[in-house]
Swiss-Prot record:
Primary gene name: rpoA
Comment text on domains: The N-terminal domain is essential for RNAP assembly and basal transcription, whereas the C-terminal domain is involved in interaction with transcriptional regulators and with upstream promoter elements.
CDD domains noted in UniProt: RNAP_alpha_NTD (cd06928)
Protein name: DNA-directed RNA polymerase subunit alpha
Swiss-Prot/TrEMBL GO biological process terms: DNA-templated transcription
Region described as Alpha C-terminal domain (alpha-CTD): spans on this chain: 264-327
Length: 327
């Protein structure tokens, strides 16, 4: 069998932000380039990045509203200019930023007459509003309006499925997509077989994160998808005629985890709680959510186990190890 040689660029790949602007509180734009790439690589990366940007990044939305004033979602309330449906649509458009996990409660409690805007939402500490001026409703008479809200962090979108409003609670269509649009284009340069490519990537976000933050998060998510292919402890790849065997490496931090287990007795581990480790809040919340409460629980998990935890990244393992090795 004849195999063609595959040319690989010896130049270091570099990325750069060539344009960044804020068109409004709820519209950010960024343009990035990555080069030099071999022919075909730019399209491969561009397609994967666009899908990750639009589908893999989490966002925070209001997903449910509840009020004793609301009989049903297409009704009108005396003293309020907007219909209930319009109020729910306005709540749907509120842009939020958070690092929360699970569901949180928020509240609107206003006395009319006056305008209700996003500024009037009483939020939990982990959530912030991007644009306080977003309109919710107009109270035309001196009435009290209280609306309980549910806030969630997720990815993709969630369409309301239930029409059962017996508890006066109304689901809201949620679009958990901070990236509003993403495009890629390719510029080729060079002659003949020496042609190389530059990838141009354009990103528009809703202001809950910048295009640069979106690019970093999408990249991390793609890396996490491919990491399982790098972790094969016992398996080997057999090449043609079984002449050579190549064993795939452990996860990069595997040996550090093993050494930590050897250094300290398990008896001590079970009395050290992760609360004492001064971990970053996001990492701490991920571990607690996975029923990891002590150092023994933590070290009984391999790196492969840890990165399977929702919202957990490879660099989080390094951060944990750095903290543990200083203790």
């Amino acid at each position: 069998m004849v195999r063609e040689k595959v040319k690989v660029s010896t130049r270091t790949l570099q990325w750069k932000c060539v344009e960044s602007r804020r068109d409004s509180k709820r519209l950010y734009y960024g343009r990035f380039i990555l080069s030099p790439l071999m022919k075909g690589q730019a399209d491969t990366i561009g397609i994967a990045m666009r899908r990750a940007l639009l589908g893999e990044i989490e966002g925070t939305c209001i997903t449910r509203a509840k009020s004793e004033n609301i009989p049903h979602d297409y009704s009108n309330i005396v003293g309020i200019q907007e219909s209930v449906h319009e109020i729910l649509m306005n709540l749907n458009e509120i842009v939020l930023r958070s690092n929360l996990y699970g569901t949180r409660n928020a509240l609107i409690c206003v006395q009319g007459p006056g305008y209700i805007t996003a500024r009037d939402i009483i939020l939990p500490p982990s959530v912030e509003i991007i644009d306080n001026t977003q309109h919710i409703a107009t109270l035309t008479e001196p009435i009290d309006l209280c609306i309980e809200l549910k806030i969630e962090r997720n990815r993709g979108y969630s369409l309301k499925m239930s029409n059962n409003f017996e508890d006066r609670s109304y689901p809201i269509d949620a679009v958990f997509m901070p990236v509003q649009n993403a495009n890629h284009s390719i510029h080729s340069y060079g002659n003949g077989n020496e042609k190389q490519e530059i990838l141009f990537l354009e990103i528009w976000t809703n202001g809950s994160l910048t295009p640069k933050e979106a690019l970093h998060e999408a990249s991390r998510n793609l890396i996490n998808l491919f990491i399982p292919f790098l972790h094969v402890e016992e398996e080997t790849f057999y090449l043609e005629n079984n002449q050579h065997q190549v064993t795939l490496p452990f996860f990069p931090f595997h040996n550090r985890l093993v050494n930590l287990r050897k250094k300290t007795k398990e008896l001590a581990f079970q009395y050290i709680f992760i609360d004492q480790l001064e971990l970053p809040p996001r990492i701490y919340n991920c571990l607690k959510k996975s029923n990891i409460h002590t150092l023994l629980d933590l070290l009984n998990n391999s790196q492969e186990d840890l990165i399977k935890i929702e919202h957990f990244h490879v660099e989080d393992v390094k951060k944990i190890l750095d903290i543990l090795e200083k203790k």
